[in-house]
């Protein structure tokens, strides 16, 4: 290849540019489906909380999932399933998500949102609005939540 041949270099640049655009188009074309899937999972989590449905979390949370809660506690998947099984010590009275945004990075998606809830947990009433971040990874054909973090909103 002759470095002094500008036509050759321009041609290679144009080919690389179009190849890059094709990949970008393919990824962004898939994003609306992923955004919808993750948004649905977030809204399904609210329904699971309101109905006390641990099966949802058994299915959606990765085995090594963790959550850093707004009260400074870390929870594991086993902790959440145990809490949900004890309906005497966990009841969601109300919950509503707002400002839900989903960003997709290949097989990873990050959801951020505000969560306003009123719950009874271990005999303590908590009524707060938090800002939260959930991280999902595509594992096989399913999206699994691998991490979550919530902090009280100001």
Feature-to-residue mapping (PLM):
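Bacterial N-terminal signal peptides
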Residues: 9-20
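N-terminal secretory signal peptides that target proteins for export/translocation
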Residues: 1-5
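A beta-strand edge to alpha-helix "cap/lid" segment located at domain peripheries
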Residues: 25-154
